[in-house]
Amino acid sequence: MSESNVSWEVVIGLETHVQLGTKSKIFTSASTTFGDDPNTHIDPVVCGLPGTLPVLNKKVLEYAVKAAMALNLNIASHSKFDRKQYFYPDLPKNYQISQFDEPIAEDGWIEVEVAEKGKETYVKKIGIERLHMEEDAGKLVHAGSDQLSGSTHSLVDYNRAGVALAEIVSKPDLRTGREAAEYAAEVRRIMRYLGVSDGNMQEGSLRCDVNISVRPTINDPFGTKVEIKNMNSFSAIQKACEYEIKRQIKAYESGEEVKQETRLWDEGKQLTKSMRSKEGSSDYRYFPDPDLGPIEVSNELKEKWRSELPELPAAKRNRYSTELGLSIYDARVLTDESSMATYFEKVVNEGGAAKSSANWITGDLAAYINSNRLTFDQLHFQPSELAEMLKMIDTGEISGKIAKEILPELLSKGGSPKQLVQERGLGMIGDPKVIEEIIDQLILKHPNEVESFRSGKKKLLGFFVGQLMKETKGKADPKLANQILNKKLQG
């Protein structure tokens, strides 16, 4: 039956798989290095050979707990590992070690700033159901196709198998594709600030599965849930959600059934397509892993790890806005990467004004960083040197134009802006007598313009300012030059 007059509510939840940045895997000492030759980081435990026993990597537990704390989750004093049974070539044991009914952390939340196109930015609190630890699976490469269907054969690389994951499951609190993308971006931001993951989506360090349904707003029950996979950017998450919302609403309004299934996002075609029917938890036949003991986290350990947490992005954004007077936009851009925020704070601590520091860092410096594929940690131009340049602008030693002229060399080599200005003879002319002499010459050279100015064409002041800057190669102190010009031209 058509429901074209019905108002639809969208319900979205995200499962975010974060690869924890430990040097070795979750239950073995095998390396986690990315990009090496296939099947070079495997051992008997990874391969599930008989007689091998897993041992939990303590650093994995630390990273998982710190991640949970940053997401305001309650840390369980007691949790356990379970075996999740499924038969697929990327799991050599034919089961995955995960956590089912007793995860390491539950019931948290984060606040997300959402900038919807054409709408005012708003803050939304998103609940987080749980965080649990598990091992990653291997990677299948399908020859002749990007998926199993259509391929001639498949190859499996177990280098990724056994890499530690923290799976973060949100509550179904998201209502738009934009909210889903912003939530995923904030989770990644937090993980990177903590240093527990690099969050590289292209390398699979952070992967998101979207669970999405629609329902008439007059009804309470959720609609049929569809899972979407294969999104490797925040833009893809948003677009996949938006496509799937339209697809499901169209199906319901046409009287069609929406199946509970897993679908893949096709970036090329910009649509989702059916992959397989979705299993329920009972299909995985979970049971406690007999080879791994219970996980216990003492209060002392919790307090120690909590004391090591850095200031997180949301707290920084708030501080930059309330204490430093920055706009919400500037605070958001500066805190997107921890290295940029650290650089900014060092500049301010060295005496750079917050607003001008933000403008230069998010503008010229960020453009240089992006075009050269660097991070602020790798920049030759030190925070103290940028602060020195900003103070020179503020005191009138150089103009903004001269600062931009010397910036390319400072960015590529670093060094003292003051010394560079002296070497190039670019310092501002601040001596009134020198400026007066130049202005007197200009007045003699342009008598007609002087007469027109005195007759009321005050816009000609800009002409004389331009001529003065041309004569001084932009080095005349603008404020002083305007004062003297006004006085001289008035006669």
From Swiss-Prot:
Family: Belongs to the GatB/GatE family. GatB subfamily.
Gene3D superfamilies: 1.10.10.410, GatB domain, N-terminal subdomain
Claim: Protein biosynthesis is one of the keywords in the record: yes
Keywords: ATP-binding, Ligase, Nucleotide-binding, Protein biosynthesis
Alphabetical GO biological process terms: glutaminyl-tRNAGln biosynthesis via transamidation; translation
The enzyme's E.C. designation: 6.3.5.-
Protein's recorded name: Aspartyl/glutamyl-tRNA(Asn/Gln) amidotransferase subunit B
Gene: gatB
TM annotation in the entry: none
Subunit text: Heterotrimer of A, B and C subunits.
Listed GO MF terms: asparaginyl-tRNA synthase (glutamine-hydrolyzing) activity; ATP binding; glutaminyl-tRNA synthase (glutamine-hydrolyzing) activity
Recorded catalytic activity of this chain's protein: L-glutamyl-tRNA(Gln) + L-glutamine + ATP + H2O = L-glutaminyl-tRNA(Gln) + L-glutamate + ADP + phosphate + H(+); L-aspartyl-tRNA(Asn) + L-glutamine + ATP + H2O = L-asparaginyl-tRNA(Asn) + L-glutamate + ADP + phosphate + 2 H(+)
Pfam families cross-referenced by the UniProt entry: GatB_N, GatB_Yqey
EC supergroup of this enzyme: ligase
Organism field: Prochlorococcus marinus (strain NATL1A)
Function summary: Allows the formation of correctly charged Asn-tRNA(Asn) or Gln-tRNA(Gln) through the transamidation of misacylated Asp-tRNA(Asn) or Glu-tRNA(Gln) in organisms which lack either or both of asparaginyl-tRNA or glutaminyl-tRNA synthetases. The reaction takes place in the presence of glutamine and ATP through an activated phospho-Asp-tRNA(Asn) or phospho-Glu-tRNA(Gln).
UniProt cross-references to InterPro entries, sorted A to Z: Asn/Gln-tRNA_amidoTrfase_suB/E, Asn/Gln-tRNA_Trfase_suB/E_cat, Asn/Gln_amidotransferase, Asn/Gln_tRNA_amidoTrase-B-like, GatB, GatB_C_1, GatB_Yqey_C_2, Gln-tRNA_amidoTrfase_suB_CS
